[in-house]
Amino acid sequence: MSVAADMEVMARKAKEASRAMAAASGAAKDAFLAGLAGLLETRREGVLAANAADLEKARAAGMDAPRLDRLTLTPAVMDGMAKACREIIALPDPVGAIESMRPRPNGLLVGCMRVPLGVICMIYESRPNVTIDAAILCLKAGNAVILKGGSEALASNLALAGLLREALEASGLPADAAQLVPTADRAAVAALCKLDELIDVMIPRGGEGLIRAVVSQATMPVLKHYKGVCHAYIDSGADEARAETIVVNAKAQRPGVCNALECLLVHVDAAPTFLPRIGDALRRVGVTMRACPRSLPLLGEGAVAAMPEDFGHEFHDLILAVKVVDSLDEALTHIHRHGSGHTEVICTENHDRAMDFLRRADASMVGVNCSTRFNDGGELGLGAEIGISTSKLHSYGPMGLVELTSAKFVVLGQGQVRG
């Protein structure tokens, strides 16, 4: 069969399995997660051997060090996947929960019940642990999942998908609720994007090119985990010691993640004192600053002149764009032009300007006097997440179990008819 035909067969199996998953009990889903955690611990050697084969091919192909790091599985990473399974067991099952039940004047009770989305297709790059992390969230939320990982991790992903299917069967759930696309052929993604009658939603997670390709081809809704061009605005009169701590944490703690700071905006009144201070602090942790003409002479060593393309760029590195602005309005205009809808924060002691920023900054998380790094499911109290959506429909921000469900109206009556 052709790749397109193979993908249609896979999607039909997933659709059938999704009906069983929607009706599955919470106990069965938790038994699956417990069983999978055990398999990840007892069968790790086979997975690590498959990963070693992927790494050998990647090195031979000249893969760079950061991508090799993302591709690598270790015993600690395997332990982390098993731990994630057990943590999700502890999360409440959203499926079947009825919210906002209210009486109508005619005696009807009207509410909303959480229901699975159906079949989710997850397309991702490099990190083989996403195979487990994505699948267990989708499955706990009562969905079936089709997984399409990067070609560089195919052997690792096949080994992990085998454990997923084994654990599903052992708990009485359909193995076809978790299927991995077993080919590196790029035609598979194009084919999956056209199966809107069988696949309910696509979730691409990876580089900007991957996400744009899926969005342009998909005939079903796409939840975009888009790039994270995150800004921090330092207001006039801000607590500079606190702002320094926030900026260093947001940029340097984990510079390669999507909620890391990429651009620092500083009010012109704060610039003469704050920029030399933050320049020293960032230099100590190895950050290179790409600065506008007004900020460059104030930052000292470690700063270079910014190019226009540095603003709006996701560096994934110890690099930070810096710009002086004349007002909160100018800061927000810059954010609206260059931001990606991910995370924006303000450091200020002025309540009115803080509230203005919260209302007007367009992002999935907007913060006052805190690091951008808090836009994370665990940090926001949502539990594990499948990604951070920068789309306003159907979910905006971290996508946890609840965000992998939808709601249907339920109406309880006693014989009422419409007149």
Curated annotation (Swiss-Prot):
Do you know which CDD domains this protein is assigned to? ALDH_F18-19_ProA-GPR
Q: What EC numbers are recorded for this enzyme?
A: 1.2.1.41
Q: Its annotated pathway?
A: Amino-acid biosynthesis; L-proline biosynthesis; L-glutamate 5-semialdehyde from L-glutamate: step 2/2
- Give the enzyme class: oxidoreductase
Molecular-function annotations in GO: glutamate-5-semialdehyde dehydrogenase activity; NADP binding
Question: Mind listing the UniProt keywords for this protein, alphabetically?
Answer: Amino-acid biosynthesis, Cytoplasm, NADP, Oxidoreductase, Proline biosynthesis
Name where it's found: Cytoplasm
A GO BP term, please? L-proline biosynthetic process
Enumerate the Gene3D superfamilies for this protein: Aldehyde Dehydrogenase, Chain A, domain 1, Aldehyde Dehydrogenase, Chain A, domain 2
Q: What is its main location?
A: cytoplasm
Which PROSITE patterns does the entry link to?
PROA
Query: Which Pfam family, any one, appears in the UniProt record?
Result: Aldedh
GO CC annotation: cytoplasm
PANTHER family per the UniProt record, alphabetical: DELTA-1-PYRROLINE-5-CARBOXYLATE SYNTHASE, GLUTAMATE SEMIALDEHYDE DEHYDROGENASE
Which protein family is it in?
Answer: Belongs to the gamma-glutamyl phosphate reductase family.
> What protein name applies here?
Gamma-glutamyl phosphate reductase
Tell me which species this is from: Solidesulfovibrio magneticus (strain ATCC 700980 / DSM 13731 / RS-1) (Desulfovibrio magneticus)
